């Protein structure tokens, strides 16, 4: 196994994962706002379309490995004829289809009395998300690690270490200047939106 393959093997993968239902937003209008922000971040050149290359780059920046051919096949089903990539409406349709496939439909989950349908080990999903931010693997997210991830995502908050430190302070319950897994988990559970 060469170095590139070993790095890819160490990264979380999108293949054959069941996602945690707790990460699915249930409030339609809030979901649309967040989805638009994600779309704009992924649309690196600002042309109003997300190409397979842009999507692959965004997933790679998040530390996720996606099979390029599988990604292209999935995305192409939602790209309108004559378009180079996904427009926001297409991205929204893809997001809804993936959400239904991973979590079950919102109607079906509500009818079954489950808060998201589908299973998945929520703790393991949280740990995988934590690892994206814990760049050095020491079990903590420092301000510099958070800043590094925000830069990779192209977020403006990455420009100021003071802003990033403030973000850390908002989550850091024991005031050690870092975010441990317990603090990260509490923060992630706190931002989950369960709509009607």
From Swiss-Prot:
Pfam families: EF-hand_6, EF-hand_7. It comes from the Eukaryota. The keyword Ubl conjugation does not apply. Ca(2+) 3 binds at residues 172, 174, 176, 178, 183. Ca(2+) 1 binds at residues 43, 45, 47, 49, 54. GO terms for molecular function: calcium ion binding. Residues 30-65, 121-156, 159-194 form the EF-hand domain. Keywords: Calcium, Metal-binding, Repeat. InterPro entries: EF-hand-dom_pair (IPR011992), EF_Hand_1_Ca_BS (IPR018247), EF_hand_dom (IPR002048), EF_hand_pair_protein_CML-like (IPR039647). SUPFAM superfamilies: EF-hand. PROSITE patterns: EF_HAND_1, EF_HAND_2. Ca(2+) 2 binds at residues 134, 136, 138, 145. Potential calcium sensor. This is Probable calcium-binding protein CML32.
């Amino acid at each position: 196994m060469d170095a590139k393959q070993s790095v890819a093997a160490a990264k979380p993968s999108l293949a054959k994962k069941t996602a945690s239902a707790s990460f699915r937003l249930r409030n339609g209008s809030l979901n649309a706002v967040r989805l638009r922000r994600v779309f704009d971040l992924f649309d690196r050149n600002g042309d109003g379309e997300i190409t397979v290359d842009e999507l692959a780059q965004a997933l790679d920046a998040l530390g996720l490995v996606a099979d390029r051919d599988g990604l292209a096949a999935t995305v192409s089903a939602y790209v309108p004829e004559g378009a180079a990539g996904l427009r926001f409406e297409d991205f929204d349709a893809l997001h809804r289809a993936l959400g239904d496939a991973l979590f079950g439909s919102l109607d079906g989950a509500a009818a079954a009395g489950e808060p998201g349908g589908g299973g998945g080990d929520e703790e393991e999903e949280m740990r995988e998300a934590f690892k994206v931010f814990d760049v050095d693997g020491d079990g903590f997210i420092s301000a510099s690690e958070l800043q590094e991830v925000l830069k990779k995502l192209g977020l403006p908050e990455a420009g100021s270490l003071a802003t990033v430190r403030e973000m850390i302070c908002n989550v850091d319950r024991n005031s050690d200047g870092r975010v441990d897994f317990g603090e990260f988990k509490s923060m992630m559970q706190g931002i989950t939106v369960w709509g009607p």
